[in-house]
């Protein structure tokens, strides 16, 4: 898709997700100006040079700036934050909490200084707590700060379900709620294969409860599985693609319903401005609507446990900041 207006997108963090997303943005041509910032000044510059060479093969022009100076993000339409320590094998997201909170604070202060009108997507883990802290430190409106998680979790669930049933993943639609972690909650009555809910597929014997439970567990451990296989590093293709999905919905006012971490104040019974993964309409104004599903008692209990973990992480940050 090619943009019909001047669009500036900035990426903060030049690791694998940031680098992959920069390449995807260049190929898609959805922004006229791309900024890539990292504390390691040469890394974003080197990656952008490599990306420019790759795009030249296809005859695609790109205007991009890389470096360590945050002043370059001034006037950005959208900013994607991937900066932070990566998760290593055996490391929980909670292990990263305070270290990455310090990173987010620094990034947020620069966003507030240079691009207070931007739409900000946070990818840094522990995701839901980091999005909350970004909102707190940046002072941006709650509708302009979101976390990328639910769309990735939903994609993983759809992928594993499609593989198990030997159908195209394009025939699968999934809804995953809750925090980005071990208590993420796929909603079986709203997740479908060929228009038939997973709940109904279980009822008619096409799927067993045991099979679905195994798929859910593999979804929850999807990131960890990749970390173990890679030995060094974590997932980056799917997270980058998830960010693209969110960026396109915002920049082109697509108003797609996308599961992502958003600030809640009453929806799903969550108060206090916590950021939790729920389906939301993303359009030109950022988060334009939160879609609220009716949950069963069991789903409600799992969701509340997930919210409790997020609340605990937020409390730890609040007490130490």
Swiss-Prot record:
UniProt source species: Anaplasma phagocytophilum (strain HZ)
Keyword presence, Translocase: no
Listed SUPFAM superfamilies: LDH C-terminal domain-like, NAD(P)-binding Rossmann-fold domains
Name by which UniProt lists this protein: Malate dehydrogenase
MF terms in GO: L-lactate dehydrogenase activity; L-malate dehydrogenase (NAD+) activity
Binding residues annotated for NAD(+), in chain numbering: 13-18, 38, 100, 123-125
UniProt cross-references to Gene3D superfamilies, sorted A to Z: Lactate dehydrogenase/glycoside hydrolase, family 4, C-terminal, NAD(P)-binding Rossmann-like Domain
Cross-referenced InterPro entries: L-lactate/malate_DH, Lactate/malate_DH_C, Lactate/malate_DH_N, Lactate_DH/Glyco_Ohase_4_C, Malate_DH_type3, NAD(P)-bd_dom_sf
Pfam families in alphabetical order: Ldh_1_C, Ldh_1_N
Function comment: Catalyzes the reversible oxidation of malate to oxaloacetate.
Catalytic activity: (S)-malate + NAD(+) = oxaloacetate + NADH + H(+)
Domain of life assignment: Bacteria
Binding locations of substrate: 87, 93, 125, 156
Active site residues per record: 180 (proton acceptor)
GO annotation (BP), single: tricarboxylic acid cycle
């Amino acid at each position: 898709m090619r943009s019909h207006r001047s669009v500036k997108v900035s990426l903060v963090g030049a690791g694998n997700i940031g680098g992959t997303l920069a390449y995807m943005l260049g190929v898609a041509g959805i922004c006229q100006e791309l900024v890539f910032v990292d504390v390691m000044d040469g890394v974003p510059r080197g990656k952008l040079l490599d990306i420019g060479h790759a795009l030249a093969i296809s005859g695609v022009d790109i205007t991009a700036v890389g470096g360590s100076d945050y002043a370059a993000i001034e006037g950005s339409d959208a900013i994607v934050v991937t900066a932070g320590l990566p998760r290593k094998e055996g490391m929980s997201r909670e292990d990263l909490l305070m270290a990455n909170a310090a990173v987010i604070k620094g990034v947020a202060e620069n966003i507030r200084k240079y691009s207070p009108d931007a739409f900000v997507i946070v990818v840094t883990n522990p995701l839901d707590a980091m999005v909350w802290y970004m909102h707190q430190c940046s002072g941006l409106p709650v509708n302009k700060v979101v976390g990328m998680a639910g769309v990735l979790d939903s994609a993983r669930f759809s992928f594993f379900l499609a593989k198990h049933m030997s159908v195209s993943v394009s025939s699968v639609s999934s809804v995953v709620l809750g925090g980005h972690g071990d208590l993420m909650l796929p909603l079986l009555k709203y997740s479908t294969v060929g228009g038939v809910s997973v709940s109904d597929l279980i009822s008619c014997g096409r799927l067993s409860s045991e099979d679905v439970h195994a798929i859910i567990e593999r979804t929850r451990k999807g990131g960890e599985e990749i970390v173990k296989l890679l030995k060094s590093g974590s997932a980056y293709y799917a997270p980058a693609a998830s960010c693209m999905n969110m960026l396109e919905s915002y920049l082109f006012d697509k108003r797609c319903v996308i599961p992502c971490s958003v600030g809640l104040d009453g929806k799903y019974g969550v108060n206090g401005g916590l950021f939790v993964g729920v389906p939301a309409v993303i359009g030109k104004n950022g988060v334009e609507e939160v879609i609220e599903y009716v949950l069963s008692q069991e789903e409600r209990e799992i969701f509340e446990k997930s919210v409790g973990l997020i609340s605990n992480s937020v409390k730890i940050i609040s007490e130490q900041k």
